[in-house]
């Protein structure tokens, strides 16, 4: 499901790479864990898989390059610090992501998760008005809403 080939990422050309020549395969139906000490490149690898960083190498998700909408619909990433559009309401954020990922029935799917996460009363709030915990819940709702084959939480 996720295939990483020869991933190399340098943040500064004068320093050693954060990740050098990493290859891995995470198969469908399996739980894959990146384990290592601080500074080993775990977060850099995950952010590269999620296509949040520029890198060298190749990353495929469900057979698609990780920068394609097809790949993004297969894999959801919930970052430690939620990355939301502060000027959008919860409902507007849901609509934006639902349309961007071409999710059929995204409103109905989101409604189920909003109820499950006890977020229905926050629908009209701007993302910047939400507490850190509520922002994290919204990030998870967005990740679940696209119904991917894999998650990174």
Short names for language-model regions:
Residues 95, 99-122:
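Conserved ABC ATPase "signature" region
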């Amino acid at each position: 499901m996720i295939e990483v080939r020869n991933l190399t990422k340098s943040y500064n050309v004068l320093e050693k790479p954060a990740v050098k020549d990493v290859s891995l395969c995470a198969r469908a139906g399996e739980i894959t864990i990146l384990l290592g000490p601080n500074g080993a490149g775990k977060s850099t690898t995950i952010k590269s898989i999620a296509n949040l960083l520029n890198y060298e190498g190749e990353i495929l998700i469900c057979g698609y390059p990780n920068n394609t909408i097809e790949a993004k619909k297969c894999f959801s990433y919930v970052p430690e610090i939620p990355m939301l559009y502060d000027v959008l309401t919860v409902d507007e954020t849901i609509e934006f992501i639902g349309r961007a990922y071409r999710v059929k029935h995204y409103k109905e799917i989101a409604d189920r998760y909003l109820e499950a996460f006890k977020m229905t009363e926050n629908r009209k709030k701007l993302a910047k008005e939400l507490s850190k915990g509520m922002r994290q819940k919204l990030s998870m709702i967005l990740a679940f809403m696209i119904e991917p084959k894999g998650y990174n939480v």
